[in-house]
Amino acid sequence: PATAAADPGSVVAGRTTGRSAAVRGRGGSVFSEASVERGLAWLAAHQADDGSWRFDLSGCRCNGGCRDPGTVASTTASTGIALLPFLGAGHTHVEGDHRETVAKGLAYLAARLRPTPRGGDLGEGTMYGQGVATLALAEAYCMTRDDMLAGPAKDSIRFIAAAQDSYAGGWRYLPGQPGDITVTAWQVAALKSAAIGGLDVPGATIDGAGQFLDRVQSRGGTSYGYQGPRATPCTSAIGLLCRMYTGWQDTDAIDRGLADLARPGPDPTAIYQNFYLAQALLQRDHPAWPRWNAKNRDQIVAQQTRLGHEAGSWFFADPDTAPGGRLAHTALAVLTLEVYYRMLPIYGPRAVE
């Protein structure tokens, strides 16, 4: 059920004590782990003094030293997506080598939350920001049970529920708009993370997300489109993982869809698609996972910048994530390489019951 909480310790253990075993058992490598650490170092070095990250890389000590800045204005979206890789590797505001970095980022998000009658508005004008930032708060709360995070996380979840399209069940840039699958996916991720952390999530909100997925599916639920059933590989990967978040029972359709997406191998430029597809294939223990993962893992490691001020970062020729620039691409690449142990909370076995 949407409101059922898993034992946080069992859900997040892979990020800390179980990390090495998870890397060995699920398809990571010493090279992917080293790549994660380089990526986290680059992210830490590009945090602004106020605790935020910016897609345009302003406010940090970069001084224009990195190419390919992003254009999205929401600082809560950029701060949220930069925090997620630290949390994914077990770093919180109370534990880990990057705890000061994480503490400043979480404090920035909490300070940016704007109280409204509908809940805590954290989006800075876009539901992308709301979903990503709420996911970071919910994950940090689940990992630490820090009461200081409970209030902001609860308020942000309440805003997400209120912002859902009451007719078709999705989310888009502004509250109440007919949904698209990319914005919807971030809200669903935040909702599932909060639910497994024990925070209240209305079951009707999760049900509504399932209704949205019904509207954008095609080919018997194996493919998914952006706002309608016209599918692309990227939107299909997102939709299939969202089906797993919402507890869809047609696992045969999910597995067929994943097989179709995995068959050509990972597109070396499609980091957004591969970020979602890696999670779905591993979560399903899909037969295509070992071969697909080996290629995806090694090509991401090989694509990481190794020299100069950009060392540790990534930039892909991916039109689906171009507005996020180097910051978003680096965060997504690190998150994808953390998939072997980043089981909390939405990716764990309890998350898709």
Residue ranges, per PLM feature:
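Patatin-like phospholipase
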Residues: 106-109
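An alpha-helical repeat/solenoid feature that recognizes helix-turn-helix modules
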Residues: 2-41, 45, 55-101, 114-158, ...
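Short, solvent-exposed mixed-charge patches
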Residues: 351-353
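Acidic carboxylate motifs that coordinate Ca2+ or other divalent cations, activating on Asp/Glu
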Residues: 50
